[in-house]
C-alpha cells in the first residue's frame, strides 16, 4: 500500500512547473501587445496630420478624433499623444502652425516628409553591408585551395623514398669495412713472426759473450 502512495506523490509536483511555464508566457504575450500598441503613437500622429487636408494644420482635438477613429484609446494615452507631438516638433517632422505646446495646431513639414521618403533609399544602402556576407563564401574557396595544397604534399612524399634508396646501398659499404679488419688481423700475426727470432738472437749474443769470458 505504501508503494503506490510514493509513485502518486511526485505526479502533482511535475504538473505544477508546467502551470508556471504557462503563467510565465502570459505576461510575455501581454508585454508584446503593449509594445505593439505603445511605440506607434508618433507614427499614428504623423499619419493623421498627413491625412488632414487643412491648410492651417490639424488641431489637437481633431488629432484625437482621428486617432480615436483608428481605434486608439485617446483618454488613456492623452499624455503620450502630447509627448509624441512635442518630440515630432523637436525633430522637425511636424510644424506647429498655431498655439504653443501640444494645444496648438500641427502640420506635416514638407521637408521632413521628403526626408522621411529619402530614408528608404538609405535602407537600400543598409542592404549593402550584406555584400560582406556574400564575401564570406570566398573563405571556403581558400579552404579548397588549402585542400589542393594538401593534395600536393603527398606528391612530395615520393622524394624521401628516392633518398631512402642510397641508404640501401650504404649497408654494403660497412660489409666491405668488416672484411678489411679481417685482413689487418691476418697481417698482424705475420709481423709477429719476425719479432720472435729477435729475442733468440739476443740470447745467442749473451751466450757468445759468456764463452768469450
UniProtKB/Swiss-Prot annotation:
Q: Which residues carry this modification: Citrulline?
A: 55
Q: Which positions does the record annotate as the modified residue N-acetylserine?
A: 1
Fetch the Gene3D superfamilies from UniProt. Answer: Winged helix-like DNA-binding domain superfamily/Winged helix DNA-binding domain
Q: Return the Basic and acidic residues bias intervals.
A: 107-119
Q: Where in the cell is it found?
A: Nucleus; Chromosome
Superkingdom per UniProt: Eukaryota
Residues recorded as bearing N6-(beta-hydroxybutyryl)lysine in the entry? 35, 53, 65, 86, 91, 107
Residue ranges, compositional bias (Basic residues): 120-131, 138-170, 179-213
Q: Per UniProt, what is one GO molecular function of this protein?
A: DNA binding
Q: Which GO terms describe its cellular component?
A: nucleosome; nucleus
UniProt keyword list: Acetylation, Chromosome, Citrullination, DNA-binding, Hydroxylation, Nucleus, Phosphoprotein
Q: Which GO terms describe its biological process?
A: nucleosome assembly
Compositionally biased residues, Low complexity: 1-15
Show the segment(s) annotated as Disordered.
1-41, 92-213
Report the residues modified as Phosphoserine. 105
Chief subcellular location equals nucleus
Q: How is it modified after translation?
A: H1 histones are progressively phosphorylated during the cell cycle, becoming maximally phosphorylated during late G2 phase and M phase, and being dephosphorylated sharply thereafter.
N6-acetyllysine (modified residue): where? 15
Stretches assigned to the H15 domain:
37-110
What task does this protein carry out? Answer: Histones H1 are necessary for the condensation of nucleosome chains into higher-order structures.
Q: Which family does it belong to?
A: Belongs to the histone H1/H5 family.
- What's the protein here called? Histone H1.3
What organism, scientifically named, is this protein from?
Answer: Oryctolagus cuniculus (Rabbit)
